[in-house]
Design a protein with these regions (language model features):
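Phosphate/oxyanion-binding active-site loops and adjacent basic polyanion-contact surfaces
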Residues: 21-25, 50-54, 194-202
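A general structural motif
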Residues: 3-6, 40, 76-78, 145, ...
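Acidic di-acidic motifs
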Residues: 12-14, 195, 221-222
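Extended hydrophobic secondary-structure segments that form protein cores and membrane-embedded regions
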Residues: 80-83, 218-222
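Conserved acidic, metal-coordinating active-site core of Asp-based
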Residues: 123-218, 226-232
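Asp-based phosphoryl-transfer active-site loop
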Residues: 2-23, 45, 81, 230
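Active-site phosphate-binding/coordination module
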Residues: 27-139
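A short, Lys/Arg-enriched amphipathic alpha-helix followed by its capping loop at the start of a domain
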Residues: 2-9, 28-41, 219, 233
Length: 235
């Protein structure tokens, strides 16, 4: 409800805080972030981006927060990021945003995703190769796979179904039931993503992180599709 008072804010990044058809953060958003921090409101970015994408975010906002809007180091510590849809938590312990990182998921889930990747490589499915490309989000430190992305060449329903059925069959055949499937955008293309978590689970992590019940957190995303990766971001 518009009259409800919120005690924390969760933001998706791409398509929500970015300029149209761009990865760059809208200038108006930076001022809004500064205003929230000044009011002692915790901010949690819940995003499919990995560490590289978060660095792009920092390049857009950090200098302006500190120098244009006079946000201080203590206020910066109210900013958190749950990257890879919640697989990793980045937080701030000094004057550099997101200088600390911890995993929020288990080694078992990371193993399942590695197993999934190994099996799809073995299969060499030509039909899948013809309609999409496979991309990865990996931890730059240890090279662990955090997301496998099937980037479709078009949005035809038949092709989406082929890829979705292929993914589900691999998951079922090898009992990889800890994995999550979501749909969204990646570099302006439609993508079906396989990962270790999803934004609805990430919201529960954010709830514990900032000590605010999820119903008291304003959640802002850009997707109203029930199988979209931002559906849980809608209050």
């Amino acid at each position: 409800s518009l009259e409800q008072k919120y005690n924390a804010v969760c933001f998706d990044i791409d398509g929500t805080l970015t300029k149209k058809n761009s990865k760059e953060i809208d200038e108006r958003v930076i001022k809004m972030i500064a205003d929230l921090l000044k009011q002692k409101i915790p901010i949690v970015f819940i995003t499919g981006r990995g560490s590289t994408g978060l660095n792009h975010l920092l390049n857009d906002i950090q200098f302006k927060l500190l120098n244009l809007y006079n946000v201080n180091n203590n206020e910066l510590k109210r900013i958190y990021a749950l990257a890879n849809d919640g697989a990793r938590l980045f937080y701030t312990s000094n004057d550099k945003i997101f200088n600390e990182c911890i995993y929020t998921i288990t080694d078992d889930k990371l193993y399942e995703l590695k197993k999934f990747d190994e099996e799809i490589i073995k299969m060499k499915n030509k039909k899948i190769d013809d309609i999409c490309k496979i991309a990865y989000s990996k931890d730059a430190v240890n090279n662990k796979i955090l997301n496998v992305r099937f980037v479709l060449q078009d949005d035809k329903d038949d092709n989406v179904k082929i890829v979705m059925d292929f993914i589900k069959n691999v998951i079922n055949d090898y009992n990889l039931n800890g994995l999550s499937i979501t749909r969204g955008k990646y570099k302006e293309s439609s993508v079906i993503q396989v990962g270790t978590t999803s934004k609805d689970i990430a919201i529960e992590t954010a709830e514990r992180l900032v000590g605010v019940p999820k119903n008291s957190m304003m959640r802002i995303g850009d997707c109203g599709d029930k199988i979209g990766n931002d559906y849980a971001m809608l209050n």
